[in-house]
């Protein structure tokens, strides 16, 4: 399993044989239902997920992990998009638990809900270990507050602290940012204040070592926001973000970890498991066929690559989303079909995405249909795979005559 911290302890998710995975099918159905994929109302989704968290918090811990292992095995036997739906569901439940811990009163810290959050979602992302029933942070864990008296920053740093202590501070509305530090200084996790991306390592110089090298912001963030720099006078190098950004980054880390764990079981080939998986997610096959059918040889390499990344649930930067959506609407895809392409992204919001795609298509706003960026701009944004296609715009690649056109 990929980790920002190579030497961090991990919770062992048990390997499950296909036959045993099938024996957990009822509990897996319950877990999948808890994701509430079919519910449109966000509050209903959160309510459903929290109900499931309450259900499992009193279960035996090893049994919870076995059910989770069975879920990963089922996902590994199904079509590729399933693993990203599973990962999105797990990350959504993790985020729900994180918000629950933030907003509950202090007595909530004694509830097993903390155990569920830590064991299933935080084992690698925030470097936790079990120690006499507590969870300790291996690296120092700073939390940056805005003091009630004014604009000064208050920084709390623990070399070791129980998760209980850290989350008590995280629940405070005064928290502005978090950075996880390695004592050596070379395994620090930096969180980009613009896009929420995480990156490991560095010298500690915010502008030179992070802002200009963030792959998601390449080409558009030449230096940090001046307002951000003003807040970084003490101590220099800390990145500031609001709790929503922390939650989004945390959710993306969880999603990546779950996908990685599922992919480690890629050799699972069991027809019964596969059929069970397809019954759980009947729309997966149709969605996959629709996306792949449109991504034929006429699509340029850059667009095929962006389609692949979107289908796999990668958190695409804004420029990549715009380029992909603008290309698809200009080759005749309808709005709903384009929105469907982005549905696996970790921060997918159907209503917002539909509005943005309609705006690109010229259906709302000023009525202007936007063209995809030209190849020079795609290269500047880091979206060109490097192959010289001999055109100046992705649409030219799509429209040029081919031998099989007759």
UniProtKB/Swiss-Prot annotation:
Q: Tell me the cofactor note.
A: Binds 1 [4Fe-4S] cluster.
Binding sites annotated in the UniProt record for [4Fe-4S] cluster: 302, 375, 384, 389
Set out the biological process GO terms recorded for this chain's protein.
DNA replication initiation; DNA replication, synthesis of primer
Q: Which GO terms describe its molecular function?
A: 4 iron, 4 sulfur cluster binding; DNA-directed RNA polymerase activity; metal ion binding
InterPro entries linked:
DNA_primase_lsu_euk/arc, DNA_primase_lsu_PriL
Q: Which UniProt keywords apply?
A: 4Fe-4S, DNA replication, Iron, Iron-sulfur, Metal-binding, Primosome
Q: Which GO terms describe its cellular component?
A: primosome complex
Name the cofactor(s). [4Fe-4S] cluster
Among the Pfam families in the record, one is: DNA_primase_lrg
PANTHER family attached to this UniProt entry = DNA PRIMASE LARGE SUBUNIT
Q: How does it assemble?
A: Heterodimer of a small subunit (PriS) and a large subunit (PriL).
**What protein family is recorded?**
Belongs to the eukaryotic-type primase large subunit family.
The record's function comment reads: Regulatory subunit of DNA primase, an RNA polymerase that catalyzes the synthesis of short RNA molecules used as primers for DNA polymerase during DNA replication. Stabilizes and modulates the activity of the small subunit, increasing the rate of DNA synthesis, and conferring RNA synthesis capability. The DNA polymerase activity may enable DNA primase to also catalyze primer extension after primer synthesis. May also play a role in DNA repair.
Name of this chain's protein:
DNA primase large subunit PriL
What species does this protein belong to? Methanopyrus kandleri (strain AV19 / DSM 6324 / JCM 9639 / NBRC 100938)
């Amino acid at each position: 399993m990929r980790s920002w911290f190579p030497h961090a302890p991990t919770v062992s998710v048990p390997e499950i044989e296909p036959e045993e995975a099938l024996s957990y099918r009822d509990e897996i159905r319950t877990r999948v239902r808890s994701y509430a994929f079919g519910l449109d109302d966000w509050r209903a989704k959160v309510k459903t997920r929290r109900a499931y968290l309450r259900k499992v918090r009193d279960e035996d811990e090893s049994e919870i992990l076995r059910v989770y292992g069975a879920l990963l095995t089922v996902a590994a036997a199904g079509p590729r998009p399933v693993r990203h739906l599973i990962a999105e569901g797990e990350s959504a439940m993790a985020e729900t638990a994180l918000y629950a811990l933030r907003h509950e009163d202090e007595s909530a810290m004694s509830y097993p809900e903390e155990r569920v959050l830590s064991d299933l979602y935080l084992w690698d992302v925030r470097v936790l270990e079990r120690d006499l029933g507590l969870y300790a942070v291996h690296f120092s864990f700073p939390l940056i507050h805005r003091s009630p008296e004014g604009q000064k920053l208050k920084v709390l740093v623990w070399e070791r602290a129980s998760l209980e202590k850290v989350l008590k501070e995280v629940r405070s509305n005064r928290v502005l940012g978090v950075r996880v530090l390695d004592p050596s200084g070379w395994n620090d996790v930096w969180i980009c204040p613009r896009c929420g991306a995480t990156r490991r390592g560095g010298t500690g110089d915010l502008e030179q070592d992070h802002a200009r090298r963030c792959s998601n912001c390449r080409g558009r963030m030449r230096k940090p926001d001046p307002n951000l720099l003003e807040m970084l006078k003490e101590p220099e190098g800390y990145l500031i973000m609001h709790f929503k950004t922390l939650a989004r980054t945390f959710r993306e880390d969880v999603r990546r970890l779950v996908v990685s764990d599922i992919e480690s079981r890629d050799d699972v080939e069991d027809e019964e498991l596969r059929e069970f998986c397809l019954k759980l997610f009947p729309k997966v096959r149709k969605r996959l066929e629709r996306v792949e059918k449109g991504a034929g040889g006429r699509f340029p390499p850059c667009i095929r690559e962006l389609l692949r990344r979107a289908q796999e649930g990668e958190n695409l930067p804004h420029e990549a989303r715009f380029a992909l959506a603008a290309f698809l609407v200009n080759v005749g895809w309808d709005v709903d079909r384009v929105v469907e392409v982005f549905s696996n992204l970790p921060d997918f919001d159907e209503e917002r995405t539909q509005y943005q795609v309609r705006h690109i298509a010229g259906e709302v706003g000023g009525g202007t249909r936007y063209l995809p960026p030209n190849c020079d701009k795609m290269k500047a944004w880091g979206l060109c795979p490097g192959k010289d296609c001999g055109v100046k715009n992705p649409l030219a690649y799509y429209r040029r005559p081919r031998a099989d056109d007759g």
